[in-house]
Amino acid sequence: MKLVTAIFKPSRLDAVIDALAAAGSSGLTVSEVRGYGRQQGKTEVYRGAEYEVRLLPKVQVDVACSDEAAERIAEAIIGAANTETIGDGKIFIRQLDTVIRIRTGERDEQAVSV
């Protein structure tokens, strides 16, 4: 099993959720996060004063899935989150050792939606 974690611009969240549903995902977790990559934050002006915003708002989506579904999930996210501008984000695919559905006690493949 895999955990696909994507961090991207908040404005792309609805498009990513729709793309994941179309790719067969029926479960995900969404978190609001902050961070920076190559863009190193940005400078904003408020009431004539410049302020450096180092940590930019992003959205993190986590999808637990089968090994076979991981690439399909990642491609769906890329298609929906890509604006071809700096700061579009990153996708991390990690191995999951165990998944347990709390309600039923189901484990691993039976406990994930994809």
Where are these regions (language model features)?
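Positively charged, small/polar-rich N-terminal and surface patches that mediate targeting and assembly
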Residues: 1-114
